[in-house]
Regions:
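Beta-strand elements of repeat-based all-beta scaffolds
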Residues: 1-268
Length: 268
């Protein structure tokens, strides 16, 4: 049964949090009064550009950023890193590329002279201007404090980068990892290949149960170690078969399975 309301008041919000920006707040609560607040800031196209949360242990904020190409596709995901701020808010120009005052799209969505699209990659971030690049570098002012001694040096590449096929399908062509040894064009990026399935391959896999080859797709992925894996998909995008392919990567200290047999197929 509802009882009488003892007290009630009217509250008016005079001004909201950074009212000139697009943002969304999410707060999670746990036992013993624990809570976690995360704010996402969006640009004019409502794409998430910066995510800010708070480290309740150090009472400082942690910032992560996403960068997009001219077609609005997510290209660069910068690792989260702590700041010296104690208030959750947008930090403009938190990450900057070398020789640039801001992260213009031309820094990573532009073909430089002497290169082609397949060999293009984003430059390093400038550790001298702060941000994530400074945190993952010898220029980190707190590098000698406690566990900070174990923070790796990203050498200006504390981000992952995605390259897309130039066919307007939005399919990924390659994806680099964090650090200089796994970035795009390092030889350790993940590459993706797309093709149609061959009828002879389907017959070998499924025998008389195989359908017509035009109804199937064959995709291949080369991981950071150089190992290829193949997936066969039906017209609904469902995976119907997977397999490893190619020779063992030179870096892999493994033996072939006893069942491995080489076979050759000649096509016209």
């Amino acid at each position: 049964t509802e009882t009488n309301w003892s007290n009630y008041n009217n509250f008016e919000f005079a001004s909201g949090h950074q009212a000139n920006l697009n943002w969304q707040s999410s707060t999670s609560f746990a036992e013993e009064g624990k809570r976690k607040s995360v704010l996402q800031y969006f640009d004019g196209s409502l794409r998430n550009r910066q995510t800010v949360t708070k480290d309740n242990t150090t009472n400082t904020t942690v910032v992560a950023e996403s960068l997009y190409d001219y077609q609005g596709r997510p290209v660069i995901q910068v690792l989260p890193s702590p700041t010296i701020n104690t208030i959750i808010k947008l930090t403009p120009n938190f990450n900057n590329f070398l020789n640039s005052s801001a992260y213009y799209k031309d820094n990573y969505d532009k073909i430089l002279p002497g290169n082609d699209y397949c060999n293009g990659a984003a430059p390093a971030l400038d550790a001298g201007k702060g941000g994530t690049a400074q945190y993952y570098s010898p220029q980190n002012p707190g590098k000698d404090a406690g566990n900070n001694k174990l923070i790796p040096d990203a050498k200006g590449f504390p981000y992952t980068e995605t390259r897309y096929l130039q066919d307007n399908t939005g399919r990924v062509a390659a994806q680099g990892g964090v650090g200089p040894d796994h970035r795009l064009n390092s030889g350790h990026e993940t590459k993706y290949f797309y093709s149609g399935a061959d009828q002879s391959e389907l017959d070998a896999l499924f025998g008389t149960e195989a359908g017509d080859a035009p109804h199937y797709f064959k995709n291949m992925v080369r991981d950071a170690n150089g190992q290829y894996s193949v997936s066969y998909l039906d017209m609904h995008g469902r995976t119907i078969a997977t397999a490893l392919a190619g020779d063992l990567p030179a870096s892999a200290k493994l033996d072939y399975l006893p069942s491995k047999q080489d076979s050759y197929l000649t096509k016209e």
